[in-house]
């Protein structure tokens, strides 16, 4: 239940402050209308947990699948549906949450219940990421986010510079049935042969990429593919999309 409530807290925090004109927002290929996306989160629980796992014959609101099934509702159509209001959409989430919790057995659950519960909760977490990048795309100010339930661990990341050598040979990709949870695109586990390679210890940080920018990386075609350089030239870019430079130095939106 804590997993579900933590994911739900993030959904609410990332959407509750949106003004009415942003409940749908502009039609862009890389985002969903928040009012639809929140309902889709609810439908995922409604379908996989209440309907498939617990056997409820009816969804918690009428026409749920016609409105929120991402496999059946074309992306561009999501802005023109007769959607419930934002208030009613959040009520839909609350109804589903209560219905799920009331059916959760005491003590440890069986593996099927545990898997579906995790799948649906992690699905909501992924949409939390989508709400965050939608706000970034549309230049919305980020809201105040309460730390996750239980707090954040204080871990020293250590030195992030340098590379690590990965020897060639056979490596297992994906996850087998011995792990507690795996997404469908992580199975089955299979073995692949690789040549040796080196890779950075960590993903590229803003600080590291800033050195590339300040060293003239956006002015030197040697660091770009032909297609990438044409794109950079067409867009007249001097730095990444959300970077701005002023007297204080580089700032990132």
Could you say what each language-model-derived stretch is?
Residues 1-18, 22-25, 30-34, 40-42, ...:
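Extended beta-strand/loop cores of jelly-roll/beta-sandwich
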């Amino acid at each position: 239940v804590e997993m579900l409530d933590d994911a739900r807290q993030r959904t609410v925090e990332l959407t509750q402050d949106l003004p009415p004109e942003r409940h749908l927002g502009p039609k862009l290929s890389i985002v969903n209308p928040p009012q639809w996306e929140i309902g889709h989160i609810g439908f995922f629980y409604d379908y996989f947990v209440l309907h498939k796992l617990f056997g409820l014959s009816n969804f918690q609101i009428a026409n749920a699948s016609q409105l929120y099934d991402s496999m059946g509702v074309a992306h561009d159509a999501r802005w023109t549906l007769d959607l419930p209001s934002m208030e009613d959409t959040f009520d839909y989430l609350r109804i589903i949450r209560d219905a799920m919790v009331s059916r959760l057995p005491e003590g440890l659950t069986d593996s099927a219940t545990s898997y579906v519960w995790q799948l649906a909760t992690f699905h909501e977490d992924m949409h939390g990421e989508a709400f965050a990048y939608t706000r970034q795309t549309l230049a919305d100010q980020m809201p105040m986010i309460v730390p996750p339930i239980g707090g954040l661990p204080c871990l020293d990341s250590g030195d992030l510079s340098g590379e690590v050598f990965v020897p060639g040979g056979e490596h297992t990709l994906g996850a087998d049935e011995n792990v507690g949870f795996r997404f469908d695109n992580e199975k089955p586990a299979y073995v692949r042969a690789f040549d040796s390679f080196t890779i950075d210890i960590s993903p590229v940080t803003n600080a590291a990429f800033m050195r590339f920018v300040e060293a003239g990386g956006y002015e030197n075609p040697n660091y770009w593919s032909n297609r990438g350089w044409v794109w950079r030239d067409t867009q007249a870019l001097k730095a990444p999309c959300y970077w701005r430079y002023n007297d204080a130095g580089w700032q990132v939106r």
